[in-house]
Design a protein with these regions (language model features):
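ATP/Mg2+-dependent ligation/transfer catalytic cores
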Residues: 1-171, 364-430
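A generic structural motif
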Residues: 51-58, 143-144, 184-190, 237-239, ...
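Conserved structured core elements
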Residues: 64, 85, 149, 153, ...
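Histidine-centered divalent-metal-coordination microenvironment in nucleic-acid enzymes
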Residues: 88-102, 171-185, 215-237
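Short beta-strand elements
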Residues: 105-121, 125-127, 227-235, 291-293, ...
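Glycine-rich tight-turn/loop motif centered on a GG-T
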Residues: 107-112, 137-145, 183-192, 238-247
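Accessory "access/gating" subregions that flank catalytic or transport cores
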Residues: 136-167, 180-187, 198-214, 262
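Catalytic-core signal marking the mid-to-C-terminal active-site face
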Residues: 200-204, 210-213, 234-430
């Protein structure tokens, strides 16, 4: 099995193969596996790549294979030996969720004991203890306001069991929201770790009678969940982002940043991959939409974290979220950064101000670009700016077309055509 791979039906995955050419092979990665901590019997979870039996090569629509090609392209270009990524994934843990999607009815309802909407509710034995973080009031409270500390502790223990080292875990700003960050790794390893993290968080919540989601914006009027992504590039065991320019960065780093900012509007098709993503990217909720950079400034879309050593020089890209496929998101970020280095793209001046306070007129006057406001727009921007993705045959034209078609048909068109409950408030009595 490990030598010959595992055959499967690729036509069962949307956007992949037609039924007439559906045979593909899963090739296990024998250095990337873990014992499933939730299985009743001993089970091993193995990360796999997809092999194309028709072209006798890694499948060009396999996200993990694309991530591997991006890392190899970095090496082949001579620009670096390895790109390190580290993700901070935010999530919500709710007590329950109800969803209805019918022709005559559209609604959802999530619930959490922490929710401010439950201030007047009687819980078990008629008791309501009253300790709640409130909207945007949940950053690092202690119990009893923080009702999820024990669940997060259990998450960390299980993550350690499956080989992930955590460096940050706490209640986040929103009600019922948490965050766990795991140690960085190379591009592919970091993407594997995101998948592993999401599995563990969802399963621990499930076994505690809760439901976890990495959806970017499940609550109106409260902060959303991002996937802040830390990046650095190394060569000959040296951090190429360390230098003598702004905040200890190198020219290489600033050009890398210039590439990401230059391509960010199309890059969002991979880093912010859902229609819901763009409800998070609005001012006032610590989710940056203005494409600029700054040191220690969480209103900028790119933050330069404080570091005491050259090895810690890195960027924190704050716009991505966990609706993205991490293999595609990380690969696209690397490709954009490499394009910036090759073409010496200037990122412009840093903006060390609270960008959330800028008016639209001020943003226009300063010539600052913003993130797209919809998934449709990000896909259109990606299609108009895709050549950098295709360098080194990392993202193929066939993959790009399949990806945009899937996103339009499965998400954009249905979202645009469905009546929304809020429209009945604004329009029903017209």
């Amino acid at each position: 099995m490990f030598k010959e791979g595992i055959p499967f039906d690729a036509s069962s995955f949307k956007g992949w193969q037609g039924i007439e050419h559906s045979d593909m092979i899963l090739t296990p990665d024998l250095v990337r596996y873990f014992i499933d901590p939730f299985s009743a019997d001993v089970s091993v979870v193995v990360f796999c790549d997809v092999y194309d039996v028709y072209k006798n090569q890694p499948y060009e629509k396999c996200p993990r294979s694309i991530a591997k090609k991006a890392l190899q392209h970095l090496k082949d270009s001579g620009l670096g030996d390895v790109a390190y990524f580290g993700a901070e994934n935010e999530f919500f843990i709710f007590d329950s969720i109800k969803i209805k999607d019918a022709s005559n009815s559209q609604y959802y309802e999530v619930d959490s004991e922490e929710g401010e909407w439950n201030r007047d509710r009687s819980f078990e034995n008629g008791v309501n203890f009253g300790h709640r973080p409130g909207k945007q009031g949940g950053y690092m409270p202690v119990p009893p306001t923080d009702t999820m500390m024990d669940i997060r502790t259990e998450i960390v223990k299980v993550l350690n069991q499956v080989g992930l080292e955590t460096f940050v875990v706490h209640h986040e700003v929103a009600q019922a929201q948490g965050e766990v960050g795991v140690k960085f790794g190379d591009l592919v390893e970091a993407a594997d770790n995101v998948q592993k993290l999401k599995y563990v968080v969802k399963m621990v919540a499930h076994l505690n009678g809760k439901t976890a989601t990495f959806m970017p914006k499940p609550l109106y009027g409260d902060n959303g969940s991002g996937m802040h992504t830390h990046v650095s590039v190394w060569k000959n065991n040296e951090n190429l982002f360390s230098g003598e320019t702004y905040k200890g960065l190198s020219g290489f780093a600033l050009h890398f940043l210039g590439g990401v900012l230059h391509h960010a509007r199309g890059l969002a098709a991979f880093t912010n991959a859902s229609t819901n993503s763009y409800k998070r990217l609005i001012p006032g909720y610590e989710a940056p939409s203005i494409l600029t950079y700054s040191a220690n400034n969480r209103s900028a879309s790119v933050r330069i974290p404080y570091g005491i050593s050259k090895n810690s020089a890195r960027f924190e890209f704050r716009f991505p979220d966990s609706s993205s496929n991490p293999y595609l998101a990380f690969a696209a970020i690397l490709m954009a950064g490499m394009d910036g280095v090759k073409n010496k793209i200037d990122p412009g001046e840093a903006m060390d101000i609270n960008l959330f306070k800028l008016t639209l007129d001020e943003i226009r006057e300063k010539g600052i670009k913003q993130m797209p406001h919809t998934l449709r727009r990000s896909l259109e921007e990606m299609l108009a700016d895709k050549q950098y993705l295709k360098e080194g045959h990392v993202f193929s034209e066939e993959f790009i077309q399949a990806y945009q078609s899937l996103k339009f048909n499965a998400e954009v068109f249905p979202w645009e055509s469905k009546p929304h409950p809020f429209e009945f408030i604004t329009t029903y009595s017209c």
